[in-house]
Amino acid sequence: MPETYMEVRMEHTEGFARKAEVLVDEESLIVCDGVSTPEVRCTPGVLESVRFSYPSLEGFEWPQAVKDNPSNRVRLEHVRGWSYAGFGRVISIMPVTIDFGFLQLEDPNWSDDKSLEGKYVKVMIDRLDMGIDDGKQWPEELR
């Protein structure tokens, strides 16, 4: 995933694996807290080395995802809780990385279709997770 600096600030958390409100470059997000521990809630303030991700709870087809964003929108639209409708542009494949404006996220639904690069898509994000970035990512030779 491309390296970009963003300021992430914890505003409030209900605790580990629960709802948290964070600011990402001044954009407010509700996320699943993977930064706190079961024993200690994360205190408000700037967070270092965090990573955002989302699991794939429902499968979809990439051609439909492209059709669902005909106006080429780029944004995360809050649905409820930690769920979002993600509108963005595919910037790479294997894994598929989508630029949602202030966040670039890897989609768990991989594709090796090069024609997907540059396309605007809509994906449903059922749970936006925030955790510690331990630096472990897919090895380059497997991308």
Residue ranges of predicted features:
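Structural detector for short beta-strands of small beta-barrel domains
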Residues: 1-15, 67-96, 122-123
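OB-fold/S1-family single-stranded nucleic acid-binding modules
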Residues: 52-82, 126-143
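Acidic (E/D-rich), amphipathic helical modules within compact regulatory domains
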Residues: 16-68
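Long, contiguous N-terminal structural blocks used for assembly/anchoring
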Residues: 13, 17-18, 143
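Beta-strand secondary-structure signal
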Residues: 19-21, 49-51, 87, 97, ...
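Generic structural motif
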Residues: 11-13, 25-27, 53-57, 93, ...
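Structural preference for solvent-exposed beta-strand-turn elements
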Residues: 2-9, 110, 114-116, 126, ...
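Beta-strand/loop nucleic-acid-binding surfaces
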Residues: 24-42, 99-131
